[in-house]
Amino acid sequence: MNEINESYDTDSVREFTVSDADAGPYALAEGPDGALWFTLVHRGAVARRDPDDGRVTVHPVGDGPTVIAPGPDGALWFTEYRAHRIGRITPEGHYASFAPLTPEGGPFGITAGPDGAMWFTLSSADRVGRVTMDGEVTEHPAPGAFPSALTAGPDGALWCTLNQGNAIGRLTPDGHGTAYPLPTPGAAPVGIAAGPDGALWFTEIGAGRIGRITVTGDLTEYPLSDPAARPHAVTAGPNGALWFTEWGSGRVGRITVDGRVTSYPLSRTDCEPHGIAVHDGALWCALETGSLARIQVPA
């Protein structure tokens, strides 16, 4: 492990208040309109931050909007964890939602698949679903317990974290699933993203580690200096590294593809960073205490 702690100066990190502390900014994604879209998990809303003037527009949706991702149809798609539905909103604010086949399934992760559809996890039902752009839903058994985040892999499959199965899952578009157990007990993986090296990278919220898995199933784990950091979401950054949020320590981390880790503090240790995404050449993360943080990526 090679971890360096650094402090951002005021030009490197800025925080923007976008809601009251009770609304809960949770996940975020850049939309096809160039704006930053984010979920307000406790308010039942999806919001848009204008890229020019920073104005925030809030759109009411179903209960518990959680993860959000752009779709191939020019809309934003998101999971409604407490409403047990999949939501869709256009850049103009037109909203629709679709019911999975399994009731009370607790949809959480969502991503655009390699087949032109959106894929999502049903964490409470141990299933993975697929919804087409016109709302047709199909489902497959997940290859393990409590599927959480998921992403499209470079091999044409969907990869997901199996939070309570302590494994990483792979699912082909036709529903064939494989689970790869993690070597660390109680790792409880959550976030996952495709890396620039052709592997999948994921967070181990229960073990304070960042993991890497190749498309053939070879696993590597990188421990953080603080085992209680609770790494949550992860994304590929614009500089060839992976960036992740440390929910338990109020920090943002960066890991290179050869395993070098750097950790940066945000304004407060209790700011609760969750989702992280690339937008306007920088990293943005959602702070559940009511703000979005913009982190300028070092050269």
UniProtKB/Swiss-Prot annotation:
Protein task: Inactivates the type B streptogramin antibiotics by linearizing the lactone ring at the ester linkage, generating a free phenylglycine carboxylate and converting the threonyl moiety into 2-amino-butenoic acid.
Required co-factors: Mg(2+)
Active site: 274
Class in the EC hierarchy, top level: lyase
Protein name as catalogued: Virginiamycin B lyase
Residue sites binding substrate per the record: 232
InterPro entries assigned: Streptogrm_lyase, Vgb, WD40/YVTN_repeat-like_dom_sf
Subunit description: Monomer.
